[in-house]
């Protein structure tokens, strides 16, 4: 679970994880890792809301002083002759955060080789959906929104706003490298995340942008 404001204060990162422990999990011998995702803007929530309510932006709302003027009757970015492109992200945020940090300075989580993890991920973003990417690690989705589910194995799991997932991961015993867990912003290259690091492993620098756009969230996992 997680606790958060139900007003514009939530956009100011007024939120925190709320983990309700189940005594039945005590015998699992697994390390818990919690990741709280946020979208962050230097603009105030009131400014962001006003931009969304404006009828002149036409699409995703630029911020940071970008010029909103122009010929509204002309071609818009992302529009083809066949019609308007899908409107995925309403706000262009300044950063995406995992546990209040970007990939410029990510949280490094110490882990044991061969250990088992329960990764609890909370999408606390106000207006951003993510695909969670475990990279070379395969995980097992075991709970959604705090409720157990039939386990689903995979390396990527979609998350919409406000959603929570629990993923169980077994680390290799010969683990010699650090492994990032990334949150890929829907339909774009922006990303955030944390890094799992066994003792002695080097941590490579990760950029805040991927080489290609992340997928658009759909209902494939629920099928």
Language model features by range: what are they?
Residues 25-27, 59, 142:
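Short, intrinsically disordered/low-complexity patches at protein termini
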Residues 39, 77-219:
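Histidine- and aromatic-rich segments of cupredoxin/plastocyanin-like copper-binding domains
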Residues 33, 37, 41-98:
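Polar, glycine-rich mid-to-C-terminal structural blocks
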Residues 15, 46-49, 131-132:
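A short secondary-structure junction signal
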Residues 28-32, 46-49, 206-209:
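Short, charged, solvent-exposed linker or helix-capping segments at domain edges/interfaces
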């Amino acid at each position: 679970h997680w606790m958060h404001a139900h007003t514009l204060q939530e956009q100011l990162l007024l939120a925190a994880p709320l983990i309700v422990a189940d005594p039945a999990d005590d015998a699992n011998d697994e390390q818990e890792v919690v990741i709280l995702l946020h979208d962050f803007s230097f603009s105030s929530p009131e400014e962001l809301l006003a931009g969304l309510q404006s009828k002149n932006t036409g699409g995703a709302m630029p911020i940071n002083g970008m010029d909103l003027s122009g010929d509204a009757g002309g071609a818009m970015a992302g529009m083809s002759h066949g019609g308007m492109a899908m409107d995925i992200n309403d706000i262009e945020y300044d950063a995406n955060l995992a546990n209040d940090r970007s990939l410029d300075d990510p949280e490094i989580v110490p882990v044991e080789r061969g250990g088992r993890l329960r990764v609890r991920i909370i999408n606390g973003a106000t207006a951003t959906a993510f695909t969670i990417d475990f990279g070379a690690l395969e995980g097992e989705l075991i709970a959604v929104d705090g409720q157990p589910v039939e386990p689903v194995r995979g390396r990527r799991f979609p998350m919409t706003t406000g959603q929570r997932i629990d993923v169980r991961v077994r680390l290799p015993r010969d683990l010699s490298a650090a492994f990032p867990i990334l949150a890929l912003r829907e339909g774009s290259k922006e990303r955030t995340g944390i890094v799992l690091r066994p003792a002695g492993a080097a941590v490579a620098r990760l950029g805040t942008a991927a080489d290609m756009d992340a997928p658009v969230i759909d209902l494939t996992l629920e099928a």
